[in-house]
Amino acid sequence: MKKPNLMIYVTKSSFKKMQNSNQELEWSQKLSLIRSREYLFSRGHARYFISTIKNISPLEVPLFSPPGKPPTLKNNFGFLSISHCKSGCLIGWSKFPLGVDIENINRDFLAKEILNKYYSIEERSLLNKYDLNKLKKIVLDYWLIKEASFKLRGGNLLSELKNLIVNQNNKTVLNKELLLTNRYLIKSFKDWRIAVSFDMNINITEPLICYSNFES
């Protein structure tokens, strides 16, 4: 069976022990306790996920992922993007570059403040017409889409936010400074809202979603 172009893996953040490389274990020792657990958990699940795609052991996956850096897969294993929130972890794998982001669907935050501080003039003008409940949902969606797009391209997230213009009609994001456009997908899955960004020349309607709730 031909593998799909895009697969995403979602799991709950139980922080159970996973298989990690010696290098990942060494890097984790330089992090705070919470950050170390989060790092080992996400990279361990990334190894597990890719191992199921490639039919190899998790420690054979050629993953290079220092803390704070975009993860890379060597040996033509494809592309990987990782995101986590308080309750879950999202791992995206594809044959092409991608960026992913995840957040709890009911996260409480100050939507008006985020809109006015981080979003473009065009977006503020468009979104300020909504009531608070609707506004919170759209501001959350835009944040997820923008962060996934940032992970696709790289750069500095906070400085890029106002340059990233979301177009809900054609499901694209324009970086008005770099004049680069990418596509996105956004959807709900269980307790989460998830976004995936990818290049304009890729046409995908639905990713294959894999969900894990096992204790390891």
Residue ranges and their predicted role:
Residues 1-216:
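Core catalytic alpha/beta fold that binds nucleotide/phospho-ligands
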